[in-house]
């Protein structure tokens, strides 16, 4: 076969196959161009899921008439000169418009801010017509009709009109979060009109824009993030652990304002929440990374969806550290969705619709809501109604010991705060975040009262988190005990992996794993963590080598140790079915208030829910 040059049309169609996957890809490119042009209003109109019509209108700087033909030519751009590593615009390759024009019927109309009239060019299947004068307000309109008409095979891979319209909406929302000062609107015959009014600049405006996309509930359950390390700044908002979702669709990441789906960023996000949410749940987060363009390569993916950091370990450490710090400092804060779910459950059961029944003799009256409850028949006498806090009478679990020896040494199980005064009244306790314990129901749930809410605590889940945090603190406070192997295990690795792993020998030794290089392509394992018991050493070393090669960290071993600690905590916690004394219940509440991450157990389930008095009044039809 003869080698020959491809035609310009075929070249553009090949490029379109890389850049333009679906109608949403077209909208992404056109909206980014509008943002680069300094637009403050961007309107998107679609029909037929974008396959029939796509139109983007903006009030940006516009394109001069003599540059319109260049705008639809390959590799013609105003955003890049000679430094491909200093990219500050969303678009820079000059491929979007010619690629779109090669597979559709494209019309480009523009009028610069200082021009008296507008001009337009048309591109049909790669063939240019114009420019010619046209009536137009200042700004630019790009209209795309019959997408993929020139490559009908691509239409077979399109989804339904509704699915494509939804994808377009998602793209506009994702871009819009990063630019709250721009007003976005979507309309068309295939959708319900949607608008995101401009909210301004700054963190407050960004949170308001995020609320337009994710709903007001996110703002009520969000923690602000703002950290910087070695010239890389991380800002944004993350949800508290109990505010999570069943998929990762509500995770947004931006690098220098560019929406990305980078596995390193989202991997770090998962790592930051690994201890506080269940494995099958996903945190809600909006993260903005700002750094020197020379420190990140955005030219590694045709659609610029992925990036490559010069120092991925720095970025991962910044994300994990900043989020963990924010979670630790958030204190006691339940998700607002928990109370709403409870109210919905009551409504679903018809609660409140039944005829009022006679009030039992021992029930509370409205006037008694903020007063001490009557003493039960057992364990609560007038002398113990307002006790001092005393330590929980709990022993370390059998799982903490092996052959009579403490695996982690003398790890103290969280105890109550014994500093509370004997004279401390329930009124003072009710001012605390989790309030004063009022009762224990079904020997598993603690009912507490604050000044304006009712709190229900799962005693096993709560104490499990307290014990787990104590064990983790013990792990980090001193080196982990190791057990020597009678015969060292030799693990064959690629030479580079072996060298990298040996370079982390000191860090691994703190976790009870003794390794040293054994020749150019092998690692000798002489000691393993005692608390892990029997293990697959070969698989562990290979997993660590892969992790160090990718992230330059050995967090996998730490995660394994934490998993064992979580199992110990589960078995070493106060069990369901155990009756607690009032002082023990109050002690548990105080320890929860002082422990980071106590809103969820080790498995990610909530340890407590809170019903505001206003919620209860709504439940009974008082609001």
Swiss-Prot record:
GO cellular component annotations of the record: mismatch repair complex
Q: Where is this region: Disordered?
A: 353-389
Any one Pfam family here would be HATPase_c_3
Could you tell me the Gene Ontology terms of the biological process aspect for this record? mismatch repair
Which is an annotated GO molecular function term of this record?
ATP binding
- Mark out the compositionally biased spans (Polar residues): 353-368
The UniProt keyword set, sorted, is: DNA damage, DNA repair
Cite the InterPro entries for this sequence: DNA_mismatch_repair_CS (IPR014762), DNA_mismatch_repair_MutL (IPR020667), DNA_mismatch_S5_2-like (IPR013507), HATPase_C_sf (IPR036890), MutL/Mlh/PMS (IPR002099), MutL/Mlh/Pms-like (IPR038973), MutL_C (IPR014790), MutL_C_dimsub (IPR042120)
Entry's NCBIfam families? mutl, PRK00095.2-4
Q: What's this protein's name? A: DNA mismatch repair protein MutL
Which organism does this record belong to? Answer: Brucella canis (strain ATCC 23365 / NCTC 10854 / RM-666)
Q: What is the lineage of its organism?
A: Bacteria, Pseudomonadati, Pseudomonadota, Alphaproteobacteria, Hyphomicrobiales
**Gene name of this polypeptide:** mutL
